[in-house]
Design a protein with these regions (language model features):
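Hydrophobic alpha-helical transmembrane segments and their immediately adjacent juxtamembrane loops
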Residues: 232-339
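Peripheral, non-transmembrane regulatory/ligand-interaction domains of membrane transport proteins
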Residues: 1-219, 223-226, 230-240, 299, ...
Length: 339
């Protein structure tokens, strides 16, 4: 559902809401400046600003497209800026596009086309009311306050990502077998999206700080430099966090390889023991099969040697012990020769 709020700001910093677009535009001609805040507007609603405030039709098209990258474009009557708001909740990164138009005596914000039910600028009216000094600088001061608010929201997203990276590291170290590596892949994708957005937003602030925009007064440039510093810091954080993700992936792979090696060694040890047992009993099985131990006379002809059975068992025991000793010596020789 679309919403719109219109405000007029006096030179002293006082502001009040108005309902009619023509009335608020007429009020701006008497002094002060205006803020037109649109949430999910229809295209026709924005097209009325083309004639009334000199907004370029292509900029209106960009406002309706939710797949734009941050940028700044200069026109004769205004400067068009696309900035992003970050919202990170339930392990999902939402990037909401904020469209801003700044002119000599107006600021227009358009948001909500890619934010579901989120309202990125819902708190701005309350924030502006508590910061009258900044908005006395005109549209430049209001633009700075909005961009500064959006940058603060980015910090919240980075805090949550840092906590998730620490949690992932603890899980990998505690029990790598039960860790899901897809978590790291998800975090890496989020960082890639953040990096892409921050890269373009830094370029916007560079152009603002070197006074490329004629509608931003020089007195407010110091405030925009502060925003640039924050964006540069966040950009460096994305690089740092990406390196941490890579390190955690390598750590996880290394620990998994260690577990597989340990499991393989245990399996080899079990097979070795079974092989030893089979090797010891193999000649005994052969002798027992030939001797036919189920009959007393199989090996004694017609004579019934009652001692033949115990002697045969004793011989088998001696052979078994001899086999065991021989096999152990062979294993030891193999170990020494392998060193």
């Amino acid at each position: 559902m679309s919403e719109r709020k219109f405000f007029h700001f006096s030179k002293t910093g006082l502001f009040y809401g108005m309902n009619n677009l023509d009335d608020v535009i007429a009020e701006s001609k008497e002094g002060g400046y205006i803020w037109l805040n649109y949430y999910k507007p229809e295209k026709d609603e924005l097209m009325t600003l083309v004639e009334k405030l000199g907004i370029h039709p292509l900029s209106v098209e960009d406002c309706m497209d939710d797949n734009q990258v941050p940028k700044i474009e200069h026109f004769p009557d205004n400067t068009f800026i696309i900035f992003n708001a970050f919202n990170y909740a339930q392990k999902i990164l939402h990037i909401d596009e904020i469209n801003l138009f700044i002119g000599k005596n107006f600021l227009i914000t358009v948001s909500g086309h890619n934010s579901d039910e989120r309202k990125p600028l819902a708190e701005m009216e309350k924030i502006i009311a508590g910061d009258p000094g900044n908005i006395r600088l005109g549209p430049s001061g209001l633009l700075h306050r909005i961009m500064d608010f959006l940058v603060d929201q980015k910090f919240n997203a980075f805090e949550v990502l840092e906590e998730e990276l620490e949690e992932a590291e603890d899980k990998i170290l505690d029990n790598p077998a039960f860790f899901e590596p897809t978590e790291l892949i998800r975090i890496r994708k989020c960082l890639q999206s953040l990096r892409k957005s921050l890269f373009h937003e830094r370029e916007i602030l560079v152009k603002i700080c070197r006074l490329d925009c004629p509608f931003i007064i020089e007195k407010s440039i110091a405030h925009f430099r502060d925003i640039y510093d924050h964006l540069a810091k966040f950009f460096e954080l994305t690089e740092t966090y990406r390196e941490i993700v890579t390190s955690l992936m390598e750590l996880y792979t290394s620990l998994q390889n260690n577990l597989m090696t340990k499991s393989a060694n245990e399996t080899n040890a079990s097979v070795r023991r079974l092989t030893l047992i089979a090797t010891v009993f193999m000649p005994l099985t052969l002798i027992a099969s030939i001797g036919g131990m189920s009959e007393w006379t199989m090996m004694t002809s017609d004579l019934s040697w009652k001692v033949s059975y115990p002697l045969f068992i004793l011989a088998m025991a001696i052979i078994a012990v001899a086999n065991y000793i021989i096999i152990r010596r062979i294993e030891k020789k193999g170990q020494f020769s392998g060193r």
